[in-house]
């Protein structure tokens, strides 16, 4: 599997075949940030406050919308307004994992109305190829109003201790991503997946999957529930294009200062990589 991680975000944006990935790289280049903040708060007020305060320093805000105790249309409207104001994308970390017919209804419709506001979603391929096919099918339907403004990340690896997302599971993640590359924009993984040998050999010259790495924290190596952290520099050095930081930012004494620090360290690591110094 090829990697274009040595290229700048601007260069990747100029040739990227996926419209949403292209937009994401353009945002990163314009704002000089590769930070995704995981805003794991439990009220709409907290979520929108964080989005507004941290918006200038991030490329993406990641939500777990089902942990909000007061989710409503005001949540959706507020997020959309702030995404436009600060030029960031919204990633709903739903981790879809069910049969195709069910995930189609969970994504486009249902109580959370995810397709209406989340630019990016993710899924596990544990149920098999059908889950990726179903989500891609929904996004490409003629009556789906959001089209190229939506994209999927395949959950290829996890940072939790003892994760079973390894080996054949990760290989299947790459296979399905290649097969449905019009909707799959990349992976959530702990590294670039260049060494994974895919059975789908139809990789085009413009193949350029985006890598998001979770579990980035400057002040901790892990938690009591098995989470294992790495630094922005180590994540970028292993092939991450975008780093995902949660408690290290939103639970800091000064979340804005923390976001700025992650932005600085993430950007410096990226510049070192594209300049051949990583």
Curated annotation (Swiss-Prot):
Keywords: Decarboxylase, Lyase, Pyrimidine biosynthesis. It catalyses: orotidine 5'-phosphate + H(+) = UMP + CO2. It is an enzyme of class 4 (lyase). Pathway: Pyrimidine metabolism; UMP biosynthesis via de novo pathway; UMP from orotate: step 2/2. Substrate binds at residues 40, 62-64, 93-102, 229, 247. Its EC number is 4.1.1.23. GO terms for molecular function: orotidine-5'-phosphate decarboxylase activity. It comes from the Eukaryota. SMART domains: OMPdecase. The active site is at residue 95. One of its GO terms (cellular component) is cytosol. GO terms for biological process: 'de novo' pyrimidine nucleobase biosynthetic process; 'de novo' UMP biosynthetic process. Belongs to the OMP decarboxylase family. This is Orotidine 5'-phosphate decarboxylase. It comes from Aspergillus fumigatus (strain ATCC MYA-4609 / CBS 101355 / FGSC A1100 / Af293) (Neosartorya fumigata). The gene is pyrG.
């Amino acid at each position: 599997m090829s990697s274009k991680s040595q290229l700048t975000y601007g260069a990747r944006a100029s040739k990227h075949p996926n419209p949403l990935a292209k937009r994401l790289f353009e945002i990163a280049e314009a704002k000089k940030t590769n930070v995704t903040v995981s805003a794991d708060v439990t009220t709409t007020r907290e979520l929108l406050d964080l989005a507004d305060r941290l918006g200038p320093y991030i490329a993406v805000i990641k939500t777990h919308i089902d942990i909000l105790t007061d989710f409503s249309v005001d949540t959706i409207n507020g997020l959309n307004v702030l995404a436009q104001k600060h030029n960031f994308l919204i990633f709903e970390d739903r981790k879809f994992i069910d049969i195709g017919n069910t995930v189609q209804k969970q994504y486009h419709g249902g109580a959370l109305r995810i397709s209406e506001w989340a630019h990016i979603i993710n899924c596990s391929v544990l149920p098999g190829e059908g889950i990726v096919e179903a989500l891609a099918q929904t996004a490409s339907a003629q009556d789906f109003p959001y089209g190229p403004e939506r994209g999927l990340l395949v959950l290829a690896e996890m940072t939790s201790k003892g994760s079973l997302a390894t080996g054949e599971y990760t290989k299947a993640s790459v296979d399905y991503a290649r097969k449905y590359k019009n909707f799959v924009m990349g992976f959530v993984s702990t590294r670039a997946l260049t060494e994974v040998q895919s059975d789908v050999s139809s990789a085009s010259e413009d193949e350029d999957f985006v890598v998001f790495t979770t579990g980035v924290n400057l002040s901790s190596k892990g938690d009591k529930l098995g989470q294992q952290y790495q630094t922005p520099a180590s994540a970028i050095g292993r092939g991450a294009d975008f780093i995902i930081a949660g408690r290290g930012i939103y639970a800091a004494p000064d979340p804005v200062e923390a976001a700025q620090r992650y932005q600085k360290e993430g950007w410096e690591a990226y510049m070192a990589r594209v300049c051949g110094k990583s």
